Amino acid sequence: CTGISLTAKDGSYVQARTIEWAYGAVLKSEYVVIPRGERLRSYTPSGDDGLQFSAKYGVVGLSVEVKEFIAEGINEAGLSAGLFFFPGYGGYEPFDATRSDVTLADMQVVQWMLTQFASIDELIASIDGVRIVALVDSAVLHWRIGEQSGRQVVMEIVGGKPRFYENRVGVLTNAPGFEWH
């Protein structure tokens, strides 16, 4: 996958992406609409409920596999986010069933970001309050988050710790890591 952003001469800002997926998989994509106030919950590797939250912002997006796994979306405040495949570079915290109440599945990070935050700064200030874990060990991800102002960051989790990079280039692909970009 490749994500790009462009700023026009008049200052308008556009984000776009491609989704290429190999291995003969069918992504089962569908449009997703999440209204303000909807109650949501994260999956966990054990099958128990993880983090539970209510949508503060309405969201539209495109999912993969199931509607909770939003690959790319935007909320009513203008915050957008997308996930990108990141195998061999990142690494999440191990799942701890005793902390399920703050556990967020990696494939649901976009859903959580877009329903909870209006800005990148709000997200950065809150990220340590959740534990992002893999539902499938081989599917490590990294994320692109953008504001309507044109500010964009990339979030990567390495060694269980989130790292944010200002993305002034406006491009992100799957692996390798953002510093390579």
What is each stretch, according to the model?
Residues C1-T98, D137:
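A contiguous strand-loop segment
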Residues T7-K9, R99-R131:
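Alpha/propeptide regions of enzymes that mature by internal proteolysis
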Residues T18-E20, F86, D128, Q148, ...:
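An acidic- and aromatic-residue-enriched active-site/binding cleft used to recognize and process polar
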Residues K28-Y31, E38-S42, R99, A105-Q108, ...:
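Glycine-rich loops and low-complexity Gly/Arg-rich segments
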Residues L83, A118, W143-R144:
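Noncatalytic scaffold domains of N-terminal-nucleophile
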Residues E122-R144, R151:
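Secretory/export targeting leaders with adjacent low-complexity proregions
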Residues V140-H181:
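Extended amphipathic alpha-helical segments with heptad-repeat/coiled-coil character used for oligomerization
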